Structures are given as C-alpha cells and as structure tokens.
C-alpha cells in the first residue's frame, strides 16, 4: 500500500500543478517554501507518474518563472512550478496500445492496395545528376513511361473509360509535325458494356482551328457542302494567310470611307450629303475650299461647290448683264436672259407672253420700235409703211398718201405727171397746159 498524497489547498495546487508534490504552507509575503520540495525531489521520494509513487527518476529541472500579480490580491506575487520530464519518459508516454497499432497497419495496407488499383502511377520524368536534358522530342519520349489507359477504371461506375482510338490516331497523324508524345493505345473490339462515343469539336487540341460554316451558294464549283463537316473526322484545317487580303480603299468606293479623301469614317462626326459620306473638314468647295457644313452647296460630277462657284462655272449667263442666272431665266434663240432683262432695245419695255418681239441686228425689238427703225418711210408723211405701199419715182408712199400735188386726189392707177418732184394728176396737168401755168 502506498500512502496517499495529502490533499492540498486550492491555492497551493495552483502554485505547483494538479499532480505536484505537497508543499509547505505559503509564507506571508506570497512566495512558496520551495526548500521542502527541493529536498524531497533530491532524495527521490516523489515521482509523478499518474499520481503514484514509482522508482526514482532522474532529477527534473525546476523552473519558477515569474508570473504577473493576481487579480484577486495584487500585493501577493504568485509563482508557478513547471517540471521538465526526461526524454525516456516522453517516449514511453507516446507509445500506443497494440490494438490501435494493429488497426492502423491494417487500414494502411488496405488503402495502399486500393490506391494501387484505383490510382496508377502517373508518367514522370526521372533524371539523375549525370543525365543530360533531352535535345529532341524522340529522346524525350524514350524517358517517359505512359500507363495503359485500359487499366484505368472509373471509381464511380467500375467500368473502363471509353477511348475513341480512331479519333486519337487521326489526331496524332494530323499533329505529327509538332512531335508531341503519343499514347500507346490499341483498338479494342469489346465495346458493348461501354458508353456511347460522343464526337465533339471540343475534344480536339485547343490550338486547332476549324473552318467557319459557309453557305452552299458561296462555295466554289469544285467543292460541295458535304465535304465541310464529317462526324467521324476531327482533322483541323488551318486557314492560309494568302486567303484574306486587305481591302483597297478607293475614292468614294465604300460607305465606310470618306468620299473626298478616302479615309476611314469609323470615328468622329460624319456628314452625309447627296448620298455621300465625308469628314466635316473634307466637306468643302472644290474651287474655293470654303467649308460647306453650314452653307448652301451644289453637287455636280462627283464634286461639291458653294453657291457662287457653282453658278460661275455651270449656270448660263444673261445676254444683257453678262452675269450668271441663279433664278428664273428666259431662253430664246440660244440666248439666256434674266426674267427682267429681256426687254425691247428701243423702248425698254419688258417682253411678256402677250407682247411679241422681233430680232434684228443682234437685238430684240417690239413691233413699234422695229417699224420705226427698220420699216420703209412714206415719202409724204415720213411714217413707216406697214401695209401696201405705192412706189413712185421718188420713193414709196402709203396708198392714202399717194395723191395729186395740186388737187390732193388719189392718183390710183390712172397715171400721173411729175412736176417739180410732185405728182400731178391728168386733169391738173391739162389745166396747167391750157393756162400756161408752168
């Protein structure tokens, strides 16, 4: 029988630990009397192994670090004692039970066996310090060990994963120029219990390019739409660089190019005029380079003009004032007039629809002015003869002006006599002869 360890007060248990040896009462100043504890430890009377007295162990080192003051009594300084166990005791305390060790070893072996069956070793590169780094893809493939894909099982279904051998072989042939490591696969005829094959463009390498769908109507004559996509072929077709050419911008050729300079219209403001699109700075007169953004303009033969330059170059000119006609015009005998400049050269009366005009000597005349200027004048009244005239020996007369100089009778067709440049009828001539009136 071992003598029980006397129960310590709560205050002393806190000082020395739950399994510490009984100590002497605390002094009045708050520090424990450690001499008794040190003497017992030196004699080997106490050993702490689960609260029982055992064979003496090597003397532990006693450390009494200073602790802060207690919150209950700040004046009393509390010290805690910590015992450092030797290394052999620590090793003995960590030894587990035989049952636990046996269970651990059994579970470890089971996990290792399942790991080897379910997760085969991945291909790895093993080089020593003396080996040299492979300089070619063929030398690299000689150092790589790849597992057989048929030995890998699906952990969820217990079935082997499906591998499309035809697809992989075609892909290897296509990218043979890249010298990629290939998998040593073999064709298998037992596919009854496997999943159906899914042909998808996503199974191809990420750097492969496939042609975009092309409508049948746009295909060349030597190609057909059936040759574009095949469900059992995943061979990528690389787009050649010479197929896409940069478009050449001509002046006014494209809606996205400026009509004047041919530059791009993708950014900034765009002006649309007469079905043409231009930069704001390019929308100017072709003659004087005036900006036409906020003024009137004219479009002719692919060029833009301001108001003045267009009329100066293309509008007809008035025959009277020699200036371009901008508004309504009068066109007669290949001549152009302003509406108010077509008037009589004699009286300046403007011609209209009701007033006829007569053209002579490169001028336009009204009837009155024309008669006054160009008509034959009567020898007697000096007025123009517009109708029937009588032609005398000294000139033409109106029919009513053709009379006898003595009696003013109409001469008619009876004949006459000229006396002193005056026509005299027959009766008047007879009287003059009778009475010697000469």
Curated annotation (Swiss-Prot):
GO terms for molecular function: F-bar domain binding; metal ion binding; Rho GDP-dissociation inhibitor activity; transcription coregulator activity. Transmembrane segments: none annotated. Keywords: LIM domain, Metal-binding, Phosphoprotein, Repeat, Zinc. One of its GO terms (cellular component) is medial cortex. One of its GO terms (biological process) is actomyosin contractile ring organization. Residues 256-316, 318-375, 376-435 form the LIM zinc-binding domain. Residues 1-37, 49-78 are annotated as: Disordered. This is LIM domain-containing protein C4F6.12. It comes from Schizosaccharomyces pombe (strain 972 / ATCC 24843) (Fission yeast).
